[in-house]
Amino acid sequence: MPENEKEPAQPTTNEDALDTGKTCLQIKELKDKERALMLAENARMQGLSEFFFSRHEDKRLYESKSTNTEDVNKAIYFSYPSRRHSCTLVNIPKPCVNKMISHIEDVESKIQEHLTQFEASFEEWTSVTKDKEAGLDVSAPEKQVHPEKGKDEKCPELKKRMETLLSEAIHLIKSLETDRAEAEQALKQHKSRKKKISMKIDSWSIWKLQELPLAVQKEHENFSKINAELRSYLEDIALKVEQLQERKEKLEKANAKLQVDIDYMASHSVLLEKKRKQELGCLKERYHKKFEVMEKFRAIHEELKESVDKCEGAKARLKNMKVENEREIQEELINATSYEKELDKLSVLDAHYTTSIETVNLDIEGDEEAMNEVLRETQSTTNELENLKKTVDDLKRLFDQYCWRQRKYENEYLEAFSNFYSLKKTWDIELSNVSKDAKDLTIVYEAQSEENKRIQSEIQSITDDIEESIKKTAEMEEEVHTFVEMKMKNNNYLKQLYKQAYQVGAVYHLSRHKTEELEDKLADLKRIFKGREELLKKLTRGDIATGIEIQKRLYAIEETQFIEMQEFIRRQVLYNMALLEVEEQLKELEAEAVRIRYLHRQHSKMLHNIRKRKERVKKNVDATKKKLLKKSKKSRMELTRTEGKRSIIHEEIEIARGQTVALHEKCIELSKEIRIMNLERTNYEERLKKLQEEFFKLQFDREHVHGVYDHLMREKQYCEERIFEEERRFRRLIDMRKNTLKNIRKCQDDLLEENLRLAKEYQSAQLIFLKEKESYFNGYDRLLSLNFSLSDKKKLCQLQKRLDQKWQEYFRLMILFNKTKLAKFQGDSQNSIQKILAVQEESSSLMQHILDFFKSFPNSSCGEDD
């Protein structure tokens, strides 16, 4: 129903306002019409409630315990709005409430009009009765009192009852308005939830469209990567098999050659054993000799180490001595430099004192003349000062006057300045208030404009989202249809693949039986070949190991002999050269050592004397310093007191200067001599070190050369004899090996022919094996690819089934969720209907009160008319 719709059955009483005789009839008609309207509205609301309760009987029965009790209805008297057929399409009870308000306002206005009409008619009637009964008896005034009493008694009561009724109606209207606002908020929340649910459904549908193909594609890519890796792994294995076959061929060739050598060695095993025994005897003898030589070498080496340790200890001692001597020399040099500095300072002080004495004499002579001039000037200045004091007093008076005037002007200026700033502050405050108001207005205007823009943008975005959701739903339906078609195609394709897989499995079983038979044959051949190969390998390994060990030992013996001969020759030459050089140098060194010892003693004595002289000089310098200090103090005191003692002090200073000059010259000479002595000492020490090192080296070489030379001569004789015997043996062995080589070559040719024949047979068997193997691997690769494709399809089907199940569960849960939401909403609506019915009952009771009021009112007036 529209908001401002009015009932057509309501009469207008403004036309009959002047007719005073028909007031009671009009009031009766109004009562009847209002009663009919209320009965019609109650019947309609009861029909609505019965229809609603018939649809939801189960829920009403469940909720009747908590909502239909009297206490709950009283507590929720004005808390929920009323709803009618006009509000079923809209979830807000605003139109019904507005209609109720307008209806009550109309009733109130009509009641007021009727009251005014009744008062006017009552006054007219009283005036008419007064005019008619003016000439009657005394009993007439008693009758006139009754209508006035009715007016005074009934009108205030009626007014009070009307006021109470109107206050209740206003309270009801306000409660309905609050309930309407709460219903509006609930409806907004419901709409927002509905939007969120629709957005979630759209997002989930988009996710299904986007993520499912991506997931399937990722799984397909993963399986394709695994297939590629397996293929590459199989290719690597095939390459490794080929490489192993090539290695096998090479090893077979090497084994054939070794077999020939083994046969040859087996035929000549007796000679080889004899040769081995002879070589072992020779090796044992040489090892015994080697051990003896090594023991001698170790003893000599230990002696050499001891001598080297002694030399290093002596060197360390000499270094320590050298360091101590250098420290002492440096300390003496530092002391000498400090003495030189002190002498320089004393000479400077002497010169300063002489100059100061001369200047003081000159100043004293000049000061006597200056004093006379100063006395004259002081007299003139005293006169000038008196004049200046007078002028200063006058100026002070003038300055005080000017200061007083300045203070007066400053006070006036400060008062004017403070007034100006106070006015300025007031103006600034007013301007700031005006600017703040303007800013607040602009901010409010901008906020409202932004809110309007935001609302418009939200409306546009909502419309766009709705259009997009509609489009997406259409696209989703199309894609679901395409997915169903793809599913049908995939099912047909899977059936064909299952048939092909069955055929491939049958072929695979047949080929497998054939390959197993061939593998059994090949295994038997391999066992035969492996037994023969293992026997040959064992024989060849043992013989080769013994031959290699013998060869290694022979080569090691030859190398050691050659190295020992070279070292012996080199040492012999070196020792001969060293002996010749050392004998000449030893004699020279002994003479130089004696001379150096004598010089060292002289230098040590000289140093001792120098140190003593140095100590004496230090003492003299200290004494002179003390004397000079004492004299300087005395001279300062005497210079200030008297002038007569200047000559004595000057003479003493000149004597001290002469002494210091002499001492300074002596110190310079001593420092030069010390430097020369230090240089000579360093040179002698360096020479001593070099000579000592050479002496120790030569002494060591001289001690060991003779023993080594004798030992080497003996070894030389022994080695020459041994070399001569070994040359004979080697010549015999060479002749024997030449004869054996000829026999080996003949046997080698025969064995090569046999190897060629066996290799051809083996190659033919290997080619047959490789052909069968290639056919088997090709079939196996095909089977693997088919198995992988079948497993991929099975996994895809399983994933699709799982997805369908999950989507079914999801939609089932969504249906249950929506059902629960609807149940809650229906329960809330039932509660609201019950509360509306309670409100209607209260309104009907109010209307009945009003009707009772109207009934009572016209009955009294009619009785008076009668």
UniProtKB/Swiss-Prot annotation:
Keyword S-adenosyl-L-methionine (UniProt): no
The keyword Lipid metabolism appears for this protein: no
Keywords: Coiled coil
Coiled-coil positions: 157-266, 292-403, 439-480, 514-539, 570-631, 665-705
Protein name: Coiled-coil domain-containing protein 178
Listed InterPro entries: CCDC178
Region Disordered, residue ranges: 1-21
GO annotation, cellular component aspect: ciliary basal body
